[in-house]
Amino acid sequence: MTVRLSSEHPRGRSAARRLRTRAAAYLAALGRADAEISILLVGDRRIRALNREWRGKDAATDVLSFPLSEPPGSGPLLGDVVISLDTAARRARQERRAVGAELDRYLAHGLLHLLGYDHERPADARRMARKEAELARAEGLVGAALREGGPARAAETETSWTRSPTSTSTRSPSGSTARGTRARSSRAGSGR
């Protein structure tokens, strides 16, 4: 398993170790110990530009995913996950949750997009939310949410992880993949 992590954000270094460890645990729990992914930590300005370019949405978002294989998740090179640290910090404050727990949620959501999960239809959204909740329970995030924000936060951690639809494109946002080459995917730009 290879998890490459880079940051364009001044606070990215503090989140890097946690996300690298969490990504490895999630991939193992998903039966994808063979996988290669890259994670890019950015601010709201950068993720807004990527969201506008790849999904036609001129707004900052929390996480974007760029699968590299067709169908998604079919090869060892899964793709890129881009996370906004600014959005994570803002939402964590709003929800009275630790920033690390918010980042864990975004990472799980992004990885599932790389594996072909989506939330285009209600049934797909429920399936994806169940898988996110399984990952949260497997990694003890529900317990962490109880410690960080009480029972309401734990319930939310388990159930409310779906957002907006996927779009398509032909390359990754950073021009790189888990191996550092330009991505070629017809399903780039999955986000919340």
From Swiss-Prot:
The keyword Hydrolase applies. One of its GO terms (cellular component) is cytoplasm. Binds 1 zinc ion. Its cofactor is Zn(2+). It is found in: Cytoplasm. Residues 142-192 are annotated as: Disordered. PROSITE patterns: UPF0054. Pfam families: YbeY. Keywords: Cytoplasm, Endonuclease, Hydrolase, Metal-binding, Nuclease, Ribosome biogenesis, rRNA processing, Zinc. Its EC number is 3.1.-.-. Residues 159-180 have a biased composition (Low complexity). SUPFAM superfamilies: Metalloproteases ('zincins'), catalytic domain (SSF55486). One of its GO terms (biological process) is rRNA processing. The keyword Zinc applies. This is Endoribonuclease YbeY. Belongs to the endoribonuclease YbeY family. InterPro entries: MetalPrtase_cat_dom_sf_prd (IPR023091), YbeY (IPR002036), YbeY_CS (IPR020549). It is an enzyme of class 3 (hydrolase). Single strand-specific metallo-endoribonuclease involved in late-stage 70S ribosome quality control and in maturation of the 3' terminus of the 16S rRNA. One of its GO terms (molecular function) is metalloendopeptidase activity. It comes from Anaeromyxobacter sp. (strain Fw109-5). Zn(2+) binds at residues 109, 113, 119.
